[in-house]
Amino acid sequence: MQSIIIRQYRFLARYLEPEFVKDPALRNANARPREKLQRLSHIQFSELLTDVADELQRRINNDPKVRFLPPVDSYHPKRNHARQKLSSLAPTRLRDLCMDVFFEVQSRYSGALKEVSSNTPPNMTRAASQPPPQVQRLPASAPKHDLYSSANASSASLHPTEQRTTSSPTIPSYANRTHTDSPTSLSHRLPNVPDTNALNTVQANNSSTSSLSQGAQTGIDSSSNYLSRIEMLESSLAKSNSLLDSSKSEMEALKAKSISDATKHKNEIFQLEEKLHEASHEAEISIKKLNDAENRIKELENNPTLSFNPELEKNLKLMQELIVAESSKTQHIVELESCIDSLKAETERWKKVAINAKSAKIDEDIRLFTMTTVPMKSIRELISPNGFLDEQLYIRYFVEMNVFVASLRRDSPSQWMSTAKDIALTLEAIVSSLREKSLLEELPDLGKKVDDLCSFTNSLMEQVRLAVINGALLPIYHVDASACSISISLMDIAKTYGLTNTGKSSLSVGRNSLHPVDDLKALSVAKTLLSEKSKQFSETNQKLLDAISSDSSSSTIQQRVHEDINVIRDTLFDVSSPLELMRDRAAYAVIHNALQEMRRYCMQLIEQEGHGENFGFTDNNSVPPLTDLAFSAAKCFKDILRAIEDAEFSVQRTQFSTR
């Protein structure tokens, strides 16, 4: 182990030689913060020294195929993860780490390094009296702020534990260090190991220092633009989260208010009914007394001898007062009955208001993912006769993006690619139509926005591909940021150039409604729609087979394949819309498997379409010939129709058994 440490120490000494010549203050070992390295055990420090030397050698080799240190089976998984994260360090951050490790080796193994000290090149101890060497200019696409932030994030996750010697080594934090490098000292690549003529090269490159200052200023301006775009995306995400929170709080408040109002009205109605019952009982008693009094009055009128009785006069006055009192009670009872009727009407009105508000809140919003909403009212306002963007594709994108982001948080990484391909297919159709419009109308600004949309899409697909390969090591918020960039760019195009109404079927809106539907009705609608799409596909598929049999040109065959793909994609989108809300999930699963089979054939047709003139002669043996794909796709329509009929029978049998 001692010989390995000495060899790695010499390697670090050769790499740090130009840095010490450029700035002699870096050689002051006592001024460097190495407290975290001093707390490491010898085994942990030797692991850190090995990892830093391997990363330095990888950057010197500059192999584009090796973007990070490959994992070693004998190492702990945490250590392999830490070795991979070393590739995210900026060159200056790696240089500082190498210096700390270099001086820590001197401090720990001072006795064993006497031989190394005698063999150290003399220009390692030479003062920095000569001007600094010329370095490569920092590219505009790599801002300094982003480099430092990624370095801090990488170094913070590599702290080992003292008990587990196989864990990853600790890399100290350099967030509070004052860098003495000039703005031009940041280089995109790690400098190669210097030779014996390094100092002569330093003097020869001194004349180009002024030109590098101007290049550094350009890099700083580009970095500021990139930071401003990041801040814009962060503000959009924050605004979207606030909109979602306000929508949720509004729905909860409306629900709580409706429940409290219903409880209050129910209690009031119950109390009024009790009062009405008591008043009715009292009214019956009063009516009975009134009838007795009237009969007594009639008897007195018929018998004149009793008319001058003073007791009778007193009783008559009491009866008249009783009649007036009972009349007022009867009037009060009538008022109570009218009040009860009004309260019942008010309760029903509030119920309708709550139901309508909830329905409007669900139907008038298209959920992007979990962060923001796009009102349907704003989409309708963007529709114009001269619009460029297809409204159906615009809504389909947001629906598929919702499915994709939900899959990110629910499914495994292996299932992310299928939902991402749906988004890519929809965006490919959008980009094709927009490019055609930009060329016909000669709109360079639209072409630039379409290029940005393509770059964001490629970035999203690359991130998903890396996440699937590496087992979701990539943070999920990176994918969310790319998805948000695509949505913002697409909404900007829609606001600038408008939408065009292509007569979208009402069945496509089924994804936007969360109301429960009848399973038989949904299956009937899907069956009707599938029959229409099957006839349309039969016509386009027959044209494709005729073009293949007549040896037509590759462009003609490619156009026929593209027509088949469009019909299949529309079928997958429209047929699945009413079926996704079915209550019988077992019946829906059978249809879903048939739809997935059709989706697979659609992807194979797209792969065939991309080969251009080499139709039927692909390098991928897993893709069947074009004619077989055409017949298989036609068979999928029959399989889906048969699955829908089986689901109808299953649903009818279930409903009959529950009656």
UniProtKB/Swiss-Prot annotation:
It holds the Pfam family VBS_C3G9. Residues 237-303 form a coiled coil. The modification Phosphoserine is found at residues 129, 167-168, 182, 242, 513, 555. One of its GO terms (biological process) is establishment of cell polarity. InterPro entries: GIT_SHD, Spa2/Sph1, VBS_C3G9. Residues 116-128, 158-187, 194-220 have a biased composition (Polar residues). Keywords: Coiled coil, Phosphoprotein. The keyword Phosphoprotein applies. This is Uncharacterized protein C3G9.05.
